[in-house]
Every structure is written in structure tokens, then in C-alpha cells.
Amino acid sequence: MNLSPREKDKLLVSMAAMVARRRLERGVKLNHPEAVALITDFIVEGARDGRSVAELMHAGAQVITRDQCMDGIAEMIHDIQVEATFPDGTKLVTVHQPIR
């Protein structure tokens, strides 16, 4: 299987998001990479499903809460920017203050 660097990155984010979901199910608080991966995966999959950029910018800030993250993680993540593939092309989605 020959994957491009972009495809490898998407696969890595998806795998990290799966780990984050499992940890949340067990009640384990997320660290920085896990929180970013979970939100990023939500945006990428939402774009794939045909949701709009505006929808994803709003919904991306509701994926996880402060209580689901280790102390200080919400303050570390000011913005998350994801280049996602929509039905009409690739667009940049920015989520401001993604953990509230």
C-alpha cells in the first residue's frame, strides 16, 4: 500500500483520535495531542460528510470540554486549524478556543 505523506498524516490523526475516544470511555483525561487529534478528526470526518465550514467551526468547539482534559490543556490550545477535504474542494477550518 503506497500512501502519500498527507494520507499518512490523516491516518495518524485518525488513530490518535481512536485512542483518545477509548481513553474518554474509560474516564481518562486527555493530554494535548489526544485533544487536538480528537477535534481534528471530528472536523475531517465532518467535511467528508458534507457539513459546511461554518458548521464545523461552531461544532468543533463542542467536541470536548475542560473536564475531559488534563489541567492546563484548554489554555494551551488557542486555535486549531485543519485543512479538510469538502465535496467542493479543500478548505481551511479554524476553531477558536476549541476546549471550553
From Swiss-Prot:
Xref: InterPro entries: Urease_gamma, Urease_gamma/gamma-beta_su, Urease_gamma_sf, Urease_subunit
Cysteines paired by S-S bonds: none
GO CC annotations, alphabetized: cytoplasm
PANTHER family linked to this entry: UREASE
Subunit structure: Heterotrimer of UreA (gamma), UreB (beta) and UreC (alpha) subunits. Three heterotrimers associate to form the active enzyme.
HAMAP family membership: Urease_gamma (MF_00739)
Protein name: Urease subunit gamma
Organism: Rhodopseudomonas palustris (strain TIE-1)
Gene: ureA
